[in-house]
From Swiss-Prot:
Organismal lineage: Eukaryota, Viridiplantae, Streptophyta, Embryophyta, Tracheophyta
Protein family membership: Belongs to the histone H4 family.
Protein's name in the database: Histone H4 variant TH091
Short name of any one Pfam family annotated for the protein: CENP-T_C
Domain of life: Eukaryota
Function summary: Core component of nucleosome. Nucleosomes wrap and compact DNA into chromatin, limiting DNA accessibility to the cellular machineries which require DNA as a template. Histones thereby play a central role in transcription regulation, DNA repair, DNA replication and chromosomal stability. DNA accessibility is regulated via a complex set of post-translational modifications of histones, also called histone code, and nucleosome remodeling.
UniProt key word Transcription: no
Subunit description: The nucleosome is a histone octamer containing two molecules each of H2A, H2B, H3 and H4 assembled in one H3-H4 heterotetramer and two H2A-H2B heterodimers. The octamer wraps approximately 147 bp of DNA.
N6-acetyllysine modified-residue sites: K6, K9, K13, K17, K21
Molecular function via GO: DNA binding; protein heterodimerization activity; structural constituent of chromatin
A cellular component term, taken from the record's GO annotations: nucleus
Length: 103
């Protein structure tokens, strides 16, 4: 560990708080053309207008589940940074094995 213990790495020592943009309604960032491109990749020819909101809802739930599991792995390892392997293991736990990111 090069002489440092696991506890403090210079984080959380106070100081000026940075202004962070409040994140709300980010799911609208998944645009209609982006959803259309994903559908095209899946072989879809025509898309109903009601699909876009439904797709955003399903994607939001899926990502919440994956991120929750990935953060659980991170916290168990006592880290503050979510790694690619945390996400790979979270996906594997849900039965969606992902290749190409190590492990």
């Amino acid at each position: 560990m090069s002489g440092r213990d696991k506890g403090g790495k210079g984080l959380g020592k106070g100081g000026a708080k940075r202004h962070r943009k409040v994140l709300r309604d980010n799911i609208q960032g998944i645009t209609k053309p982006a959803i259309r491109r994903l559908a095209r990749r899946g072989g879809v020819k025509r898309i109903s207008g009601l699909i876009y909101e439904e797709t955003r809802g399903v994607l939001k739930i899926f990502l919440e589940n994956v991120i929750r599991d990935a953060v659980t792995y991170t916290e168990h390892a006592r880290r503050k940074t979510v790694t690619a392997m945390d996400v790979v293991y979270a996906l594997k736990r849900q039965g969606r094995t992902l290749y190409g990111f190590g492990g």
